[in-house]
Each structure stands twice: as C-alpha cells, then as structure tokens.
C-alpha cells in the first residue's frame, strides 16, 4: 500500500520550517521585489501629493484662489512657486514630518472641520500660526530655497525693505516675520506681531 502524501498546507509548512537553499533564495528574491515595489509606491505617493493639483483638490474654495492672485503665482518673469515649494520641506526627514501633519489636515477637511470657506476662515488664524511657527523654527528654509539675502541688491529695493533685509542677520529675524500673507489672505491679526519695527 502506498504512503498517503500530506496535504498541501502540511507540505508547505514542512518546506517553510526546513528551508532549503532554494527556499531561502526565493524568500530573499520575493523580499527584494516587495521592497522595491514598496519604495516605488511610496515615492509615487509622495510625488502625487506634492503637486499643486493635489493641494487644490481640497483648497479650491479657500487658499488656492488667493494663491492664484499672489506674487508667487503671477510674476513678471514667469518663475513662480507652487504650494509644495513653500509648504513641503525638501529634506527627507522634515518632509515626512510635514506629510504626517498634512494627513491630519486632510482628515480635518474630510471630517468637516474646515470643509467650507466659512469654517476655513474660522480656523484661518490657528492654521496660519501653525505654519508661521514651522517657518520661524526652520529659519524660513523654504523661502531661502529661492531667496538669498546675501545676493540681494539693496539699491534696487525700497528703502524700508532694504533696511529690513540688512537687519535680518543682526536681529535674528527671518522671512516669515515680515512676509506673512505673501501668498494667502491674512487672518484677523489682532494681537499678532507683524514683524520688524522700522527705526529710521
């Protein structure tokens, strides 16, 4: 009488418990393929969520129209900055931290906290202060990806702007201290520090 073969699950378990060279090789290859696919998918997701179109999908009624009338969108040279240029850091660690915070913001939109212009405006100061604090903490790094105070020609600026830019280094100020509202409508600024005090 012939021996009965163990069922397929039992055979797989035995194969898995006593891995041969082929089994180990298969596991390594499948793990490598899985890792590559995960990395590609992860980067694809990062790129898709780093576009102006993605940002506008939630901000079509509030922040996006304001941006379209800003100096960062309409420029005499045609060189502009899109949403991720200002709101998403370039460095990987800082970018991941910002993406986690952005996920909370997307959640707030879809759960109805800021899904209308009225609700958005009610939370505008809170959201703006969070963004200003982030920019202050990183010395307005996203601004400095394009703007370099050391390369500014102060003679071509209005006198007050030239004075302020020259004082930045000595007073420990950064771009966002004076340039709040550069791309979006300002909230009610009662009690909010506006930036440099110009002393002539």
From Swiss-Prot:
Periplasmic topological intervals: 43-200
Binding-site residues, heme 3: 143, 146-147
A GO biological process held by the record: denitrification pathway
Binding site for heme 4: 175, 178-179
Ranges per topology, Cytoplasmic: 1-21
Residue sites binding heme 1 per the record: 55, 58, 60, 105
Membrane-protein topology: Single-pass membrane protein
Cell cycle keyword on record: no
Pfam families: Cytochrom_NNT
The keyword Membrane appears for this protein: yes
Protein keywords: Cell inner membrane, Cell membrane, Electron transport, Heme, Iron, Membrane, Metal-binding, Transmembrane, Transmembrane helix, Transport
Any one GO CC term of the record: plasma membrane
Transmembrane segments: 22-42
Main location: membrane
Binding site for substrate: 99
Binding positions for heme 2 per the UniProt entry: 83, 86-87, 184
Annotated NCBIfam families: napC_nirT (TIGR02161)
Family: Belongs to the NapC/NirT/NrfH family.
Protein name: Cytochrome c-type protein NapC
UniProt gene name: napC
